[in-house]
Amino acid sequence: MNAVKHLLPQVPQYFKANLHTHSTISDGKLTPEEVKEGYKALGYQILCLTDHNTIVNHSDMNEPDFLMLTGIEININAPDMTKVGSKTYHMILIAKEPDNLWCPAKLHRWFPINEEYERKTQYGDLVLQYSPDSINNMIAKANEKGFLVMYNHPTWSCQTYPDYAGLKGLWGMELRNTECCMIGHDENNFRVYRDLLNQGNRVYPLGTDDMHNRRSLGKSWIMVGAPELSYGSVIEALKKGDFYMSCGPEIMDLWIEGGKLKVICSDAKRINLETHGRIARNVIAKDNNWLREAEVDLTDFIDKVKED
């Protein structure tokens, strides 16, 4: 009998989540309550409000069928940030505990500061500069302080290989940020993601919409396979990579059996398997039909299946 290795958790329900969102607390156009209602209307169950350089616990907005995560987007700009095409690091920190309001330093904000949020924030004393060493120091400190660290939209940030090649300790990276194409650059970051993987990093791929206004709602997301909709359960699933990203298709099951990768999904025209090299496998729907399942033989180009 061939052993079966499931690549997605076998749980009763997956929860739709967005982990990169802005409100009127920073430079968004909608209040936190309006943001939540917008996502809830689209079938989301998890939302992380990640306002710029400002961290807030939104647990008071939780409902039995909707969970708010605590997070912040950190911006570290190059000295020439006023110029077109200048570089910037944007990193999201997602707190493993809802009341963890640590922030690495007091950073520049170009919007009104809420004094109540300011009093509750636990500021660190890091000196943040635009350099890989400085960012790595922040990532290490954020991991130590109980956060998951996500690297945001490097293509939109005009970053190149030397800016990200040495980054260590990342939990995730935006493979797709659908707001970027609306404000001046490519929404996809596939090349950067492959570079990080090829260096031996385990970094999970994220889909987000980086919502600042209603036009951005619901363009890209992740589906989280957690046993229940609680803060601890969702964070544990995120830590382990028990989720997948999507801009539309749903994956019902994904597993390896008998040297073959098998998938069951919602309607798709094409299913691709890409690898770290120049080898791929494609299954394409025929005669204007839809694909709802596929299998790909792995024996020619996968040496082994990792167990961890």
Residue ranges and their predicted role:
Residues 2-148, 152, 159-161, 166-168, ...:
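A metal-dependent hydrolase metal-coordination microenvironment
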Residues 174-180, 197-200, 242-245:
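Short, well-ordered alpha-helical segments in soluble proteins
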Residues 1-10, 14, 200-204, 209-308:
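C-terminal functional module detector
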Residues 188-202:
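Short, hydrophobic/aliphatic alpha-helical segments
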Residues 170-172, 296:
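Alpha-helical membrane segments in multi-pass integral membrane proteins
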